[in-house]
Amino acid sequence: MTQLAIGKPAPLGAHYDGQGVNFTLFSAHAERVELCVFDANGQEHRYDLPGHSGDIWHGYLPDARPGLRYGYRVHGPWQPAEGHRFNPAKLLIDPCARQIDGEFKDNPLLHAGHNEPDYRDNAAIAPKCVVVVDHYDWEDDAPPRTPWGSTIIYEAHVKGLTYLHPEIPVEIRGTYKALGHPVMINYLKQLGITALELLPVAQFASEPRLQRMGLSNYWGYNPVAMFALHPAYACSPETALDEFRDAIKALHKAGIEVILDIVLNHSAELDLDGPLFSLRGIDNRSYYWIREDGDYHNWTGCGNTLNLSHPAVVDYASACLRYWVETCHVDGFRFDLAAVMGRTPEFRQDAPLFTAIQNCPVLSQVKLIAEPWDIAPGGYQVGNFPPLFAEWNDHFRDAARRFWLHYDLPLGAFAGRFAASSDVFKRNGRLPSAAINLVTAHDGFTLRDCVCFNHKHNEANGEENRDGTNNNYSNNHGKEGLGGSLDLVERRRDSIHALLTTLLLSQGTPMLLAGDEHGHSQYGNNNAYCQDNQLTWLDWSQASSGLTAFTAALIHLRKRIPALVENRWWEEGDGNVRWLNRYAQPLSTDEWQNGPKQLQILLSDRFLIAINATLEVTEIVLPAGEWHAIPPFAGEDNPVITAVWQGPAHGLCVFQR
């Protein structure tokens, strides 16, 4: 039987050098680590890792080749009160594995035990890691490096974006390949998108609770192997990595960046009753935030929280991010529940992971976007991230909806959000692009549902409609649900136009939810994380071509307005912005706080956004000059206006002089 050589303690994971494979695994509290390899017949062969450098266990297996399936058994104390849950009866996934063979099914054997260990061996049904070799021809690929001021983000789900697209070949719909298909790329280019932000593509598992209900985790925020691509989005699991890189290369050639939504806050092992896949059995005490009683701090709402202040976990997270940039050429990351990244346990801008990213010559050069909160006390950190990060701006989302759908927001508050929420983000040398403005996202109502539903309708999720937020700031315009009279449809359309215009012509970085430009509806489900079906898949055959054209025209208009693309804070008298009332005069203090919802925003001294958010048709006196409406607001008859615009109720128009 081949013996393991000591090998090297770096890099982490399994790496083939042409002669064999070097294996490394971090565990500060293990007493012994067994490498378990499986032959073509499924026969298991075990080897003790002979090397032990600090907290890194390592060994080298001569003559091992790519395609080898492996896992680990980690020996150590079973002391739940101390946070130790070692159980060598359970085969464990390498946290740095780049391919997984097998499925993460709901099975009692995939649990370590709660108070007492479960010593039933699970190797027969446990997923296995696969050794891969990395050879890929990137040709002349180069990152687009779109300036932040010119960035337009499109948030999409790999499967949902293309699964029903009639012009994409059936055999690749819903896959990584489809992202790089010319039809998809041409669509994104015509729309004006510069960055495709993908919901999680790292391998994830469906929670046992969902599996028992016949549902699955659709969004992917339940990670199990952070270096491995989710195989369900590949035409073949063996070629997933190349399919993904082919898509990125094609998108880059079209000038489109790729941003990955990544989950570094918790794992699919969930709470103490959850499954055992990897980290819990490798070094529970190091990888997770542990309470004094040995249970987890649940700052994520998912049962556990990764301890990103532990040096080894920081190294693991940093290596993961570098892998996606260096191996897959991704252009940035959106970090789910990113406040966890800064916990020490209190949130700090100089937290270890933030510092590591800041000091990394690779990671400090890509786009970094934070979802700036978690669910624990002190978890709401909007505006408090380090300067390298942009942040989801929920202030903007709520203000836009309140102004146009609830009519209860003063002009001053609306203007503050329109101006990149400078009261929140203008600090520490940050630029307006730090505000990622959004009206909708994967989490919540779609744009169409914002104007068709007053209440969430999440019954299909199996939680009796208890899940999902109740604070939607939506307005069904008088009838719950889709459809209705022509007047109702037109009023809803006008509200959608107003919200899109506010999003795409505001200062900051706009993020558009895929499908909002189509009129996609989830029929009132505002938490469709477990709906892998026609509720979430974009139905291209039913897309509103008029709304798509309207959205594209707004995006292309945005790119013509210097005040929006120069990425500089607006200052009084700098010519970037003037705020005027319905009479083209500067607003008084009282008008800012108590005036009617009528406003004119003059950008770059040439582009005028005239707003009438009242219930009545109102005359708006335009500033001096000859004005004409511009696409998408220009009609066939587009006369020059020199004096007054008849502003329809809840309406707006954009002019140029």
Curated annotation (Swiss-Prot):
GO terms for biological process: glycogen catabolic process. One of its GO terms (molecular function) is glycogen debranching enzyme activity. It is an enzyme of class 3 (hydrolase). Pathway: Glycan degradation; glycogen degradation. Keywords: Carbohydrate metabolism, Glycogen metabolism, Glycosidase, Hydrolase. Residues 458-479 are annotated as: Disordered. Its EC number is 3.2.1.196. SMART domains: Aamy (SM00642). The active site is at D336, E371. Residues 458-467 have a biased composition (Basic and acidic residues). The record marks D443 as: Transition state stabilizer. It comes from the Bacteria. Removes maltotriose and maltotetraose chains that are attached by 1,6-alpha-linkage to the limit dextrin main chain, generating a debranched limit dextrin. PANTHER family: GLYCOGEN DEBRANCHING ENZYME (PTHR43002). This is Glycogen debranching enzyme. The gene is glgX.
